[in-house]
A protein has these predicted regions:
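A short, flexible beta-alpha/helix-coil linker loop
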Residues: 59-62, 99-102, 137-139, 200-203
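Short, flexible active-site loop motifs that bind/organize anionic cofactors or intermediates
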Residues: 12, 64, 103, 143, ...
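Histidine-bearing beta->alpha loop at or near hydrolase active sites
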Residues: 172-173, 202
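N-terminal pre-domain/capping segments
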Residues: 1-87, 158, 162, 178, ...
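Active-site acidic/histidine proton-transfer and metal-coordination neighborhood
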Residues: 40, 67-166, 176
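Conserved beta-strand positions
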Residues: 31, 36, 95, 133, ...
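Bacterial c-di-GMP phosphodiesterase catalytic domain signature
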Residues: 179-186, 190
Length: 203
């Protein structure tokens, strides 16, 4: 079994002080990586000898992959993010489905997400970088978010059928939406490349 490498989200610690001091504290605690930080923090993280596990590859959580009118923008943003990921040896980029909107069913939204991910997948495969679509809850924190169930996310991944397109499985969010976490993870582990962990309730 591959050892677990613990990473911490930048937003959890960012307010604790100056970036260099915060990064040092994270390293002293024993974390291997910092993730979800803004790119201007990347050099500080790497200079401290830490990894960057993942960062957000494109703009806008609510206005995401599930709208075709966003695809050109997101494609360009992901291409720029691939360059950053290569520069700083980041193995994964985070992607976001976007929120539900009138006139598009969840099935149609999945197909639209698969279209743009299929377009980007060959680049991800060539560069050896994962595209991880995050599962978020739509009941508490992100009302309307479309990728709010493991089944839906896996359906998108199966349509794309790329070894570099997978899910970011967020344990906090999926406990709110589904529960039965261990069984769900075991049954779908081939479609999961990254995990986020937090307790529920209370996070």
């Amino acid at each position: 079994m591959t050892p677990i490498k613990q990473s911490i989200c930048w937003g959890v610690v960012a307010a604790a002080g100056e970036p260099a001091d915060v990064v040092k504290q994270v390293k002293d605690i024993g974390y291997a990586s910092i993730e979800m930080s803004p790119p201007e923090i990347f050099p500080i993280i790497k200079d401290a000898g830490l990894d960057i596990a993942i960062f957000v590859g494109h703009k806008s959580l609510a206005d995401g992959l599930n709208k075709r009118e966003n695809h050109e923008r997101i494609y360009d943003e992901l291409m720029a993010s691939f360059e950053l990921a290569e520069q700083y040896q980041v193995p994964s980029l985070l992607c976001l489905s976007g929120n539900r909107y009138e006139g598009v069913s969840d099935l149609q939204g999945a197909e639209i997400c698969a279209e743009i991910l299929s377009r980007v997948a060959p680049v991800a495969e060539e560069k050896g970088i994962n595209l991880c679509m995050e599962l978020l809850n739509s009941r508490v924190n992100h009302p309307g978010y479309m990728c709010d169930s493991t089944e839906w996310g896996v359906h998108v991944c199966k349509m794309v059928n790329s070894p570099r397109v997978a899910l970011l499985y967020d344990i906090y969010h999926m406990q709110i939406m589904e529960g039965d976490l261990i069984r769900t993870i075991q049954n779908n582990i081939q479609w999961i490349k990254h995990f986020h962990t937090a307790g529920n309730p209370g996070r």
